[in-house]
Amino acid sequence: MSTAVSLPQLAIGEEVPASPRRALYPASAPADSFADSQRYYENLYGPTRYDANTRALTVRAHAFRALMVTRDLADVASEALHGQTLPIFAVRHGIRVLMTAPPTAADDIVRFFPRGVTIVGRAAELALPTPGNPTRWWLAAFPEGAELPPYHEVVEAVLGACSG
């Protein structure tokens, strides 16, 4: 049995309230319940599972990659992409997760290692924002389709933010 969760409105770019105890989703989020979220994520990224430790739906990074960065790096990187759709969600302790397409063979994934950026690599498990769990919430660009920004463009934006 699933319980519907009423989702508050969040305009893209709006400041997240100081207390992240409630999950925030943008108005475009089609999923308003646990079951809806699970179906939606599975359509985008493949099989999901509920992780009792994180109390979140998780998915393996096959159809995407993710970069975990500080709030400041995420803000600068997002601006550097000049309005390109970049799904970003927050994790309660000031961490931002930027969703990107998988790297191509030409992409250099080790460029991040000295920069303090954590890469959610191939087949790694990622906990996603989940209704009823206040520790992760979408900030911008709730993924509305399977198309994600190219890995190298997000890498360049984050590296530029690291240098700036």
Predicted regions and their residues:
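A recognition module on extended beta-rich or small alphabeta surfaces enriched in W/G with H and D/E
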Residues: 120-148
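Signature for HUH/AEP ssDNA processing cores
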Residues: 1-93, 102-104, 138-164
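Helical (often loop-to-helix) elements that flank the catalytic cores of nucleotide-handling enzymes
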Residues: 99-123
